[in-house]
UniProtKB/Swiss-Prot annotation:
Belongs to the RNA polymerase beta chain family. This is DNA-directed RNA polymerase subunit beta. One of its GO terms (biological process) is DNA-templated transcription. GO terms for cellular component: DNA-directed RNA polymerase complex. Keywords: DNA-directed RNA polymerase, Nucleotidyltransferase, Transcription, Transferase. It comes from the Bacteria. CDD domains: RNA_pol_B_RPB2.
Length: 1226
């Protein structure tokens, strides 16, 4: 690595600052740390969250007869038994043992029995933010779900408002108006009753109390009022009952409307004044009064009893039962939980209108005040009061993230509730003297829920490891599907659509095409998740028109009230906003505002988009649909044999490669003292300790691509034998044995080397003189990077610490003989010959030798009935040697399985003892290379019970064979740029036939110019032009998203590189040597080879497996199936009158079993006439009709019934014609 010169990088960014980027896999790591709290030194002082909260919510457990109680003290985490790599090799789970200190207290004697109880193995997150489950790397994707809290919505069709109380766990409570204009409450979407019944059950018993709770009132005079004054009160409603004092009769009930008759009655009764409801905005709104009329009760006791009889029909209603039921539904922590988030949402919703009641409130159950406030809010919505709005459920203030830690906690809660049930059962059954925590606790439910969650949950996914970007994006993915989320079929347009609150939190571009569009999203680059699970994005604060250095993270609902300037706003030297009017964002609008009215400013232009999208240069010139494809296709790029960083990038490449944790990053400041292909040794500052970093070499990823790390740091070796004559910071001088002087410079580009020898020291050729100085990584408490550590080794698709998913190739945009018609791509033979787009793919093949009823299977070289050629690459134990070239059908591991043995005769026993296994009755069950695969064996792993390896039950020995294959670029392979410009290789042209430039340089690739204008992805044109300048000048460009190079910048560099400003060149036809008529646009474009390789897709079948029922060939490459001839193909053959071809295809080539066997015989014997039989699908049809009670009878021409099964045998002898009749059963 010594002496390697780095490319100079030119960054066009004026505003973009990547230093503020959070750690990109922080969402995974922080969430799991929150759950586990493994770094807390005092185990008894963990915070009430995650795993600790699960234990605390389950314990203490009291026995049903109250004679003992089980308490929890704290949990202890052990060390994982194996390293992550060992787990991958042995198909094990990377987990640590979880133990809990549990006390059993016997109440009668006060005796305390304390034990440390093993609670099972808990899967642990690796440093990369992944889990290893049964040897496979998996990622738990964060879920985007509706936040708990109270939500108000508006139904446009019915023109009504509704309110919903959504808890984290427990019964849902809803309020809405029914068809009769009554405000009703619904519990769990089933039980319906007037909302006032619930309000009265909370202690506000009379109608008057309820009305006074929600409305203000005003007294109006009756006695002595003029007719004009009395007219004003007509149509208004009383807030209290008006009673005739003499008779005690209620003349007007609370909520009654005042009319002329009522006024005359009031005058007769000599009522001086009435207290009337003051409706908001003076509009009469009777929905609450209608509910009071409907509920039919007028005191607390009647209300709560009626509530109980509605909820628990058929059960006896007493005040005690009713109160218990109401408490169970909403006020008990055991059955109802809003979560911290739900309480926070309720407080922030009502604090605005009722600050005294809600500030500082921490209760996680519902409170009567919450229900009252909800009813008040919905009444104000119906009255159209100012500052009362329905909620937007798609707003990110109402959707939150459930990350790994929370998802595991929720699963464990269900497991622990089952454990609690088992403990209570065992407490009653077992003798009190013998009981201990260990005997009472069953850990089966816990291990079951853990295994189910990691193994089969929709949110625990097999990690996409195609390349580092795919891995990083997978960890940052947000999924709105899954348990407790949306379903693909019911999600409408609104949920999927881009919302203004997504700005800086979720990427508006990166989402799949197809049914999951808008449901699976990606976090924006700068976004982070706060303690409540809401997405936050950073802004620079603006005070009095001056941009401060302070950065604040805002959630979507906090952002609602502010005006936010764009990152591109012009700032002077003092940091003040220059222009008088500045374009800002406010909710969904873009108003112009004075600098003094602005509170915040965007941090960087790329905070809108995700990491994938931020890797597209000139994104601002691409259409959004193509940018979406570009983002998604970068994740499918196959790591190449020779990585090359793009000439034109965005500056995000380095950070994406670093944060993906695919490279090896140095942990402590120091000096590299030794480097080889497998290890890097770094001596720490001070020289007392050293760290050894092990490199991963040629391992298979989940997707079969090759994972290989290569060192990029180095040491300085002496090239001669001699003595060190001079050592300084700048250089080391070595005097050779013959007196020659050799100088070694210690500063090359950005790499600084530190001497590890001293003057006068004897050195031999190859001795280490100096090591590269490396910086250690430093993180803050949140896991964000304060100081980036030196990258010691590149991973796959990384070039010198820079993400390198493809290669820079010389391209021209011109049609060429139709070979690049419709997005096809013409490439030069040089690309194939020089392995420009070659990649290594690794396949794993596994065989297990099991114990069978007839004896054990054996891995052996002694396999009956095979030629010596089949054994040529097997070793003496029957396993293939490393380095062997294998083709389809070759034996990888020889294995025999015993057949059913009869009693052996003495002669057979003698033969068996002389000739060994071959004479024995065994069947060949060797592992062979499957169809369509070939390559070189690169690794073999053997595990057996004899070597104390852990194997699944019944398995005696297991062998894994890894076969690698170099895949060159082929016709049919899919390739793409970063702008959604994808295509398929149509032809590999000889280099001499490719178009060439005036200086004789042949092109690498020819693309169709018609693919650009209609798709509106002009970013590729700018990239190609700037790429040519980069190639000529020997530099690399970084053009950040929305903050990159402008046309003038591109022109300036083209001038510097002596290139035409339009990047058009005179090209010559390689076949004729004649120039093309027009000049052609040429330059260097970055092209990726995608994981859609033609070799994985191409497939042919002669004979193969058939479906059991229909006897038709199976479908698909995986089943070695055939090509389906569907009804449309049948129509086409019918149209041409090709009756014999059609008959052949529908019978002997498909499901005519007899005909299939006969045609084989005919081909062997050379007979050309063949008579088709009856297709098996006809028999299936007959049986299907019989299942529908239709009696199908087959008759010959004379009307005799023919049995179809006999008929098959008869068919070859008989030439009779058959007719079919259908007789419907009466």
């Amino acid at each position: 690595m010594y002496g390697q010169v780095e490319r100079k990088r030119v960054n066009f960014g004026k505003i973009t600052n990547l230093d503020y980027l959070p750690n990109l896999i922080q969402i995974q790591k922080r969430s799991f740390d929150w759950f586990l709290q493994a770094d807390v030194k005092d185990e008894t002082k963990r915070r009430h969250q995650g795993l600790e909260a699960v234990f605390r919510e389950t314990f203490p457990i009291e026995s049903p007869n109250n004679d003992m109680i089980m308490e929890y003290s704290h949990y202890i985490l052990g060390e994982p038994k194996r390293s992550p790599q060992e787990c991958k090799d042995t198909d094990a789970t990377f987990a640590m043992p979880l133990k809990a200190v549990i006390r059993l207290i016997i109440k009668e004697t006060g005796e305390i029995r304390e034990q440390t109880v093993y609670m099972g193995d808990l899967p642990v997150m690796t440093e990369q933010g992944t889990f290893i489950i049964n040897g496979a790397e998996r990622v738990v994707v964060s879920q985007l779900h509706r936040s708990p809290g109270i939500f108000f919505s508006y139904d446009m069709e019915r023109d009504v408002f509704s309110a919903r109380v959504i808890p984290y766990r427990g019964s849902w409570l809803e309020f809405e108006m029914d068809n009769k204009g009554i405000l009703i409450a619904k519990i769990d979407r089933k039980k319906k009753f007037p909302a006032t019944l619930l309000v009265k059950s909370l202690g506000h018993g009379t109608n008057e109390e309820v009305l006074r709770l929600f409305y203000s009132s005003k007294k109006e005079k009756i006695a002595g009022a003029t007719s004009k004054d009395l007219k004003k009160i007509l149509g208004r409603r009383t807030i209290n009952d008006i009673i005739n004092m003499e008779t005690g009769e209620v003349m007007l009930e609370a909520g009654s409307k005042i009319n002329e008759d009522n006024i005359s009655i009031l005058k007769e009764m000599k009522v001086k004044e009435v207290e009337l409801i003051e409706f908001p905005k003076g509009k009469d709104n009777p929905i609450l009064i209608n509910a009071l009329e409907k509920d039919g009760v007028n005191d607390y006791e009647d209300a709560i009893l009626k509530f109980h009889s509605l909820m628990r029909q058929g059960e006896p209603s007493t005040i005690e039962n009713a109160t218990t039921e109401l408490t169970r539904l909403f006020f008990s922590p055991k059955t109802f939980d809003l979560g911290e988030v739900g309480r926070y949402k309720i407080n922030s919703k009502f604090e605005f209108n009722n600050p005294k009641e809600f500030s500082g409130e921490k209760s996680r159950v519902l409170r009567p005040a919450d229900i009252i406030e909800t009813v008040r809010y919905i009444l104000n919505l119906f009255s159209e009061t100012e500052n009362y709005y329905p909620d937007d459920i798609d707003h990110l203030g109402n959707r939150r993230i459930r990350s790994v830690g929370e998802l595991i906690s929720n699963q464990l809660k269900t497991g622990f509730s089952r454990v609690e049930r088992v403990i209570k059962e065992r407490m009653t059954v077992q003798e009190i003297e013998t009981q201990t925590p260990q005997l009472l606790i069953s850990i089966k439910p816990i291990t079951a829920v853990i295994n189910e969650f990691f193994g089969s949950s929709q949110l625990s996914q097999f990690m996409d490891q195609t390349n580092p970007l795919a891995e990083l994006t997978h960890k940052r993915r947000l999924n709105a599907l899954g348990p407790g989320g949306l379903s693909r079929d019911r999600a409408g347009m609104e949920v999927r659509d881009v919302h203004y609150s997504h700005y800086g939190r979720m990427c508006p571009i990166e989402t799949p095409e197809g049914p999951n569009i808008g449901l699976i999203l990606s976090m924006s680059s700068y976004a982070r998740v706060n303690d409540y699970g809401f997405l936050e994005t950073p802004y620079r604060t603006v005070k009095n028109g001056k941009v401060t250095g302070q950065i604040e993270h805002l959630t979507a609902d906090k952002e609602e009230y502010h005006y936010i300037a764009q990152a591109s706003g012009v700032i002077d030297e003092k940091g003040e906003l220059k222009n008088k009017l500045i374009s800002t964002r406010h909710r969904g609008d873009f108003p112009f505002r004075n600098p003094s009215e602005i509170q915040y400013m965007d941090l960087a232009p790329l905070q809108v988009v995700s990491v994938s999208t931020a890797l597209i240069p000139f994104l601002e010139h691409d259409d959004a649909n193509r940018a979406l494809m570009g983002s998604n296709m970068q994740r499918q790029a196959v790591p190449l044999l020779r990585e090359e960083a793009p000439f034109v990038g965005t500056g995000m490449e380095t950070r994406a490669a670093y944060d993906s944790r695919i490279c090896i990053v140095n942990k402590h400041d120091g000096v590299v003292t030794s480097v080889d292909a497998e290890n890097i040794v770094v001596e720490r500052k001070g020289g007392k300790e050293s760290d050894t970093y092990q490199l991963t070499k040629f391992k298979k990823t989940n997707q079969g691509t090759c994972f290989n790390q290569k060192p990029i740091v180095g040491v300085v070796h002496s090239e001669i034998n001699g003595k060190v004559s001079k050592v300084s910071k700048e250089k080391i001088e070595v005097t050779g044995e013959n007196g020659e002087l050799k100088e070694y410079v210690l500063q090359i580009g950005s790499k600084q080397y530190s001497p590890i020898v001293s003057a006068g020291e004897e050195v031999k050729r190859g001795s280490t003189l100096a090591g590269q100085v490396v910086v250690g990584e430093k993180l803050d408490e949140m896991g964000n990077i304060l100081v980036k550590g030196t990258v010691l080794a590149d991973g796959p698709a990384v070039d010198n610490g820079v993400l390198a998913l493809g290669r820079n190739v010389l391209a021209a945009f011109m049609p060429w003989e139709g070979y690049n018609f419709e997005d096809a791509i013409l490439i030069s033979e040089r690309i194939v010959r020089d392995d420009v787009f070659s990649s290594i793919h690794i396949e794993e093949f596994e065989i297990q030798a099991r114990e069978t009823k007839l004896g054990p299977e054996q891995i052996t070289r002694d396999i009956p009935n095979l030629s010596d050629k089949a054994f040529r690459d097997l070793d003496e134990t029957g396993v293939i040697r490393i380095g062997a070239e294998v083709k389809p059908g070759d034996i990888l591991v020889g294995m025999v399985t015993p057949k059913g043995e009869t009693d052996l005769t003495p002669e057979y026993k003698l033969l068996h003892s002389i000739f060994g296994e071959k004479a024995k009755d065994v069947r060949d069950s060797s592992l062979r290379m499957p169809n369509g695969f070939e390559g070189t064996v690169i690794d073999i792993k053997r595990f057996s019970r004899e070597n104390q390896d852990e194997l699944p039950a019944g398995v005696e020995e297991m062998v894994k064979v890894f076969v690698a294959r170099k895949r060159k670029l082929l016709v049919g392979d899919k390739m793409a740029g970063r702008h959604g410009n994808k295509g398929v290789v149509a032809r590999v042209m000889a280099e001499e036939d490719m178009p060439y430039m005036e200086d004789g340089t042949p092109l690498d690739i020819v693309l169709n110019p018609l693919g650009v204008p209609s798709r509106m992805n002009l970013g590729q044109i700018f990239e190609t032009q700037l790429g040519f300048a980069a190639s000529k000048l020997g530099i690399s460009f970084e053009t950040p998203v929305f903050d990159g190079a402008e046309e003038s910048d591109v022109d300036n560099f083209c001038k510097e590189a002596n290139l035409p400003l339009n990047s058009k060149f005179k090209l010559y036809d390689g076949r004729t040597g004649l120039p093309f008529m027009n000049e052609v646009f040429c330059g260097y474009i970055y092209i990726l080879k995608l994981a859609h390789l033609v070799e994985d897709k191409i497939h042919a079948r002669s004979t193969g497996p058939y479906s059991l029922v229909t006897q038709q060939p199976l479908g698909g490459k995986a089943q070695f199936g055939g090509q389906r001839l569907g009804e449309m193909e049948v129509w086409a053959l019918e149209a041409y009158g090709a009756s014999h071809t059609l008959q052949e295809l529908l019978t002997i080539k498909s499901d005519d079993m007899l005909g299939r066997a006969r045609i084989y015989e005919a081909i062997v014997k050379g007979i050309h006439s063949i008579k088709p039989g009856i297709p098996e699908s006809f028999n299936v049809l007959v049986q299907e009709l019989r299942g529908l009670a239709l009696d199908i009878i087959i008759t010959d021409s004379e009307g005799n019934t023919v049995d179809i099964s006999d008929y098959e045998d008869e068919y070859s002898k008989s030439k009779k014609k058959i007719k079919f009749e259908t007789i419907e059963n009466a």
